[in-house]
């Protein structure tokens, strides 16, 4: 599966900013190529029900669907993949449980990036590129830290953390395969329009 093209514009849900299903539909209308369902500490049943609806929408728009952390939910709703952080299920165990899922690894340093690649991650979510309101205590790697990771690994890299319309071009020029955003889309009044704005710049730079 050549999923790299679908990592260009990767939108992550945040219910503190917007309800999931309506905002995902608007992001897809605006050109999102991947959606990640991220809800911390939600009941499993609720995640399953929301995930089922997002799966329908992503199928309709030809986008990839990822679930943050929860392999069980990803499998239950027939998601394309799962995103795993350093405190989540180890990549190699996730691969045994779900051999057909695309596994993304969240990495915060060059060392973590190389380790995740070695353990079999399909792509990396690398950051935080800039300070971010979504995760205030996260380490900032900056543009240079991101470029180091891009140059060191062979698997696709998606940049995350504080990315917006003002800085997205600079991020894309590091050679990343895509960008992941939360606030730049979910924190705006018009989700569709915000997504369209990012998509235009991505198409200009990445083609």
Swiss-Prot record:
GO cellular component, one term: cytoplasm
Note on how the cofactor is bound: Binds 1 Mg(2+) ion per subunit.
InterPro entries per record: Aldolase_TIM (IPR013785), ThiamineP_synth_sf (IPR036206), ThiamineP_synth_TenI (IPR022998), TMP_synthase (IPR034291)
EC number assigned by the record: 2.5.1.3
Positions that bind Mg(2+): 69, 88
Class of the enzyme per the UniProt entry, highest EC level: transferase
GO molecular function ontology, one term from the record: magnesium ion binding
Binding positions for 2-[(2R,5Z)-2-carboxy-4-methylthiazol-5(2H)-ylidene]ethyl phosphate per the UniProt entry: 132-134, 162, 182-183
Binding site for 4-amino-2-methyl-5-(diphosphooxymethyl)pyrimidine: 36-40, 68, 106, 135
Entries under SUPFAM superfamilies matching the protein: Thiamin phosphate synthase
Reactions catalysed according to its record: 2-[(2R,5Z)-2-carboxy-4-methylthiazol-5(2H)-ylidene]ethyl phosphate + 4-amino-2-methyl-5-(diphosphooxymethyl)pyrimidine + 2 H(+) = thiamine phosphate + CO2 + diphosphate; 2-(2-carboxy-4-methylthiazol-5-yl)ethyl phosphate + 4-amino-2-methyl-5-(diphosphooxymethyl)pyrimidine + 2 H(+) = thiamine phosphate + CO2 + diphosphate; 4-methyl-5-(2-phosphooxyethyl)-thiazole + 4-amino-2-methyl-5-(diphosphooxymethyl)pyrimidine + H(+) = thiamine phosphate + diphosphate
Functional pathway: Cofactor biosynthesis; thiamine diphosphate biosynthesis; thiamine phosphate from 4-amino-2-methyl-5-diphosphomethylpyrimidine and 4-methyl-5-(2-phosphoethyl)-thiazole: step 1/1
Keyword list, A-Z: Magnesium, Metal-binding, Thiamine biosynthesis, Transferase
BP term (GO), one: thiamine biosynthetic process
Pfam families noted in UniProt: TMP-TENI
Function: Condenses 4-methyl-5-(beta-hydroxyethyl)thiazole monophosphate (THZ-P) and 2-methyl-4-amino-5-hydroxymethyl pyrimidine pyrophosphate (HMP-PP) to form thiamine monophosphate (TMP).
Family: Belongs to the thiamine-phosphate synthase family.
NCBIfam families: thiE
Name of the protein described by the UniProt record: Thiamine-phosphate synthase
Species of provenance: Pyrococcus horikoshii (strain ATCC 700860 / DSM 12428 / JCM 9974 / NBRC 100139 / OT-3)
Gene: thiE
């Amino acid at each position: 599966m050549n999923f790299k093209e679908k990592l260009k514009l990767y939108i992550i849900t945040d219910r503190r900013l917007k309800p999931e299903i309506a905002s995902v539909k608007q992001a897809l209308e605006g050109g999102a190529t991947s959606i990640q369902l991220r809800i911390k500490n939600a009941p499993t049943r609720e995640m399953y029900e929301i995930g089922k609806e997002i799966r329908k929408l992503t199928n309709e728009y030809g986008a990839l669907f990822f679930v943050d952390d929860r392999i069980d939910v990803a499998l239950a709703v027939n998601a394309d993949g799962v995103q795993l952080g350093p405190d989540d299920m180890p990549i190699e165990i996730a691969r045994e449980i779900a051999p057909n899922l695309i596994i993304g690894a969240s990495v915060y340093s060059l060392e973590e990036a190389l380790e995740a690649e070695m353990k079999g991650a399909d792509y990396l979510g690398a950051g935080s590129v800039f300070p971010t309101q979504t995760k205030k205590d996260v380490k900032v790697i900056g543009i240079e830290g991101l470029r180091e990771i891009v140059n060191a690994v062979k698997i696709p890299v998606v940049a995350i953390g504080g990315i917006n319309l003002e800085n997205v071009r600079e991020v894309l020029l590091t050679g990343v395969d895509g960008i992941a955003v939360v606030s730049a889309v979910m924190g705006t009044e018009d989700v569709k329009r915000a997504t369209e704005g990012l998509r235009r710049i991505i198409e200009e730079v990445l083609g």
